[in-house]
Amino acid sequence: MLILPIVKGEYKKDYSLKHLTWFKVGGNAEIFFKPFDSEDLASFLIQNKQKLPITTFGAGSNIIIRDGGIEGVTIKLGQNFSNIEFIDEHLIVGSSCLNYNLAKFCQANAITGFEFLVGIPGTIGGGVVMNAGAYDSEFKDIIVKIEAIDFAGNFLTFTNEEIGFKYRSNNLPKDLIILKAVFKVNKGDSENILLRMNEINNARSATQPIKERTGGSTFANPEGLKSWELIDKAGLRGYRIGGASMSELHCNFMINNGDATAKDLEDLGDFVRQKVFEDSGVELKWEIKRLGRYV
């Protein structure tokens, strides 16, 4: 019998995750949990005596939830984890804060170095995990440290060096939930910051299918190469499986054309990886996370 810890937050059983993802596909979470605050989350983790599998869920922007759903407990940090504070020349930002919202806050307060976040969908927590980046900037360039909690309920702190940022990854333990990120602050000019953010937005609109059901970049760029060029060279621009296709506008973006399943999207991605390897000898690595049971 499934026994859930007593919490202040909210549980939902057999909860559909489809509407929470940018692709709008996928199955249900066996248990969906939104903790009230970090102490509530710690209490849940400490009480998880059955060792229920734990999956963390952010803004759903760079993720495929498989059609079979997710076993165990899927944890989503809500509004109580999205605060932005300016303390002692540092920004302290909750992990569920959207990258876009932090970029706007920084522009309004004449803080430079965060302009690139306006072009990165998702949350601060997800950005840290992926070392997300665009337009010649990455999270590793602005992070001082993070505050996190492990699956045993222990609060931990990691400095930038300890995080071990790499291209689209890091050396953090896998059984970790990021709670806050601390950023260094460099003052700039609000108008110049806004101009740069507008340049980024205009570039995205011109080159990326941002109005489609997409999950952002599908594959990380191999060293010294561009994934989209390899995909294009293999003749896969616009290639379709079921309701999923590679974008005609930017062929490193997958699109749900309205009737795709998670299987369509993942099968398309795997097919593209196979064909690019056959064509160029390069093994593309997924940038989009795939979670749950493949069916």
Curated annotation (Swiss-Prot):
It catalyses: UDP-N-acetyl-alpha-D-muramate + NADP(+) = UDP-N-acetyl-3-O-(1-carboxyvinyl)-alpha-D-glucosamine + NADPH + H(+). It is an enzyme of class 1 (oxidoreductase). Pathway: Cell wall biogenesis; peptidoglycan biosynthesis. GO terms for molecular function: FAD binding; UDP-N-acetylmuramate dehydrogenase activity. Residues 24-188 form the FAD-binding PCMH-type domain. It is found in: Cytoplasm. PROSITE patterns: FAD_PCMH. Its cofactor is FAD. InterPro entries: FAD-bd_PCMH, FAD-bd_PCMH-like_sf, FAD-bd_PCMH_sub1, FAD-bd_PCMH_sub2, MurB, MurB_C, MurB_C_sf, Oxid_FAD_bind_N. Its EC number is 1.3.1.98. Its main location: cytoplasm. Pfam families: FAD_binding_4, MurB_C. One of its GO terms (cellular component) is cytosol. The active site is at 168, 217 (proton donor), 287. Transmembrane segments: none annotated. Coiled coil: none annotated. Keywords: Cell cycle, Cell division, Cell shape, Cell wall biogenesis/degradation, Cytoplasm, FAD, Flavoprotein, NADP, Oxidoreductase, Peptidoglycan synthesis. GO terms for biological process: cell division; cell wall organization; peptidoglycan biosynthetic process; regulation of cell shape. Cell wall formation. Belongs to the MurB family. HAMAP family: MurB. This is UDP-N-acetylenolpyruvoylglucosamine reductase. It comes from Rickettsia felis (strain ATCC VR-1525 / URRWXCal2) (Rickettsia azadi). The lineage of its organism: Bacteria, Pseudomonadati, Pseudomonadota, Alphaproteobacteria, Rickettsiales. The gene is murB.
